């Protein structure tokens, strides 16, 4: 009798971690393969390009007409002093925050755009 993939998955799911490690070792020996080598081959494949980006940079592209409001928004978002925030706004395009989550980046972009700035999320 042949087992379906679903039955095999259910059987594996019911095993303990130790039993699964032993199963993997037995399969590696039986088939002459290494699970680590297969994982590296899969990771290097085209799926890598399809992964969703998790860290974003917020770039101030321009201050717009209301520079004072943008400077206040930049100060609030970055914690910079007045002079540093003013210098940052005047040196646009400039990176405001790096490596933040998508939600945080979108919220910051919305806040700065409401103040009149042109903002990019990269």
Curated annotation (Swiss-Prot):
Presence of the UniProt keyword Ribosomal protein in the record: yes
InterPro entries per UniProt: Ribosomal_bL12 (IPR000206), Ribosomal_bL12_C (IPR013823), Ribosomal_bL12_C/ClpS-like (IPR014719), Ribosomal_bL12_oligo (IPR008932), Ribosomal_bL12_oligo_N_sf (IPR036235)
UniProtKB keywords: Ribonucleoprotein, Ribosomal protein
Pfam families given in the database record: Ribosomal_L12, Ribosomal_L12_N
Residue ranges of the TM segments: none
GO MF term set: mRNA binding; structural constituent of ribosome
Matches recorded under CDD domains: Ribosomal_L7_L12
Gene Ontology terms: cellular component: cytosolic large ribosomal subunit
GO BP annotation list: translation
Described function: Forms part of the ribosomal stalk which helps the ribosome interact with GTP-bound translation factors. Is thus essential for accurate translation.
Subunit structure: Homodimer. Part of the ribosomal stalk of the 50S ribosomal subunit. Forms a multimeric L10(L12)X complex, where L10 forms an elongated spine to which 2 to 4 L12 dimers bind in a sequential fashion. Binds GTP-bound translation factors.
NCBIfam families: L12
Similarity remark: Belongs to the bacterial ribosomal protein bL12 family.
Protein name as it appears in the record: Large ribosomal subunit protein bL12
Protein species of origin: Pasteurella multocida (strain Pm70)
């Amino acid at each position: 009798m042949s087992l379906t993939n679903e039955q095999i998955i259910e059987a594996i799911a019911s095993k303990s971690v130790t039993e699964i490690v032993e199963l993997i070792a037995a399969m590696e020996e039986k088939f002459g393969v290494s699970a680590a080598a297969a994982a590296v081959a899969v990771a290097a494949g085209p799926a890598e390009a399809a992964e969703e980006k998790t860290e974003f940079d917020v770039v101030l592209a321009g201050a717009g007409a209301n520079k004072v409001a943008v400077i206040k928004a930049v100060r609030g978002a970055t914690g910079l002093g007045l002079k540093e925030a003013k210098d940052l706004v005047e040196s646009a395009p400039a990176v405001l925050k790096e490596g933040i989550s998508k939600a945080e980046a979108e919220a910051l972009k919305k806040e700065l755009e409401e103040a009149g700035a042109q903002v990019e999320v990269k």
